[in-house]
UniProtKB/Swiss-Prot annotation:
Pfam families: L51_S25_CI-B8. Residues 94-106 have a biased composition (Polar residues). It comes from the Eukaryota. Residues 87-118 are annotated as: Disordered. One of its GO terms (molecular function) is structural constituent of ribosome. Disulfide bonds: none annotated. This is Large ribosomal subunit protein mL61. Coiled coil: none annotated. Component of the mitochondrial large ribosomal subunit (mt-LSU). Mature N.crassa 74S mitochondrial ribosomes consist of a small (37S) and a large (54S) subunit. The 37S small subunit contains a 16S ribosomal RNA (16S mt-rRNA) and 32 different proteins. The 54S large subunit contains a 23S rRNA (23S mt-rRNA) and 42 different proteins. One of its GO terms (cellular component) is ribosome. Its main location: mitochondrion. Component of the mitochondrial ribosome (mitoribosome), a dedicated translation machinery responsible for the synthesis of mitochondrial genome-encoded proteins, including at least some of the essential transmembrane subunits of the mitochondrial respiratory chain. The mitoribosomes are attached to the mitochondrial inner membrane and translation products are cotranslationally integrated into the membrane. The lineage of its organism: Eukaryota, Fungi, Dikarya, Ascomycota, Pezizomycotina. Belongs to the mitochondrion-specific ribosomal protein mL61 family.
Length: 201
């Protein structure tokens, strides 16, 4: 049972990251992606956070060479902005200035575009993650990745495993309940026997 659950979790993670909203190939002109939003979801930061947790991993999976940096701040009333960097000059050499690493203390703001680059921003505040994703795909020209036949087959296998695991889980629950009832009945019988014995002494 534990092995089945472990396999279910692995299959679920693979399917979730390979397909679905956010699985898309970015054009080569996109050089970097930067997101800034607050730690908590209040004040309009729920959509950006959900995009970061659910959509960005898929984008990173399909575009491993594109740096994607997250700058989380403690300013709930502050902006929630995505900055997308494009290379305008196809012959321009990549910038030698290191792109900042992700930060949880607001210390990695979006840098200015390098020479030969331009930026496009998306205001994410008070917006649903699906709306943010649509604007991202529209502005970048990214192409959504469709599930392959193998993905669909694995999804069917996952559904079958999930269904069987639910059946097994219910069967084990009933067995455990029966054992508990049997144990309770045995304890009651022993208690009754002790009471009868004590009464007849």
């Amino acid at each position: 049972m534990v092995g089945v659950i472990r396999r279910l979790n692995v299959v679920r993670e693979l399917l979730n990251i390979r397909a679905g909203p956010g699985a898309a190939l970015l054009p080569k002109e996109v050089t970097k992606v930067h997101m800034q939003f607050a730690h908590r979801i209040e004040e309009g930061h729920m959509g950006p956070r959900k995009f970061w947790r659910e959509n960005l991993p898929k984008l990173k999976y399909w575009n491993p060479a594109v740096p994607m940096v997250i700058n989380r701040t403690t300013d709930q009333k502050g902006p929630a902005v995505m900055t997308i960097y494009f290379r305008d000059d196809k012959d321009a050499k990549p910038s030698s200035t290191p792109f900042p690493t992700s930060s949880a203390d607001g210390s990695s703001p979006a840098p200015k575009p390098a020479q030969g680059e331009r930026i496009v921003t998306i205001d994410m505040k008070n917006r649903n993650s699906s709306v943010i994703l649509k604007e991202f795909l529209d502005k970048t020209g990214a192409v959504a990745v469709q599930p392959t036949a193998k993905d669909e087959e694995e999804f069917r296998e996952f559904e079958d495993l999930h269904r069987r695991s639910e059946i097994d889980r219910e069967r084990i629950r009933k067995m455990n309940d029966a054992k508990k009832r049997e144990k309770a009945m045995l304890a009651k019988a022993m208690s009754d026997a002790q009471s009868i014995k004590a009464a007849s002494a």
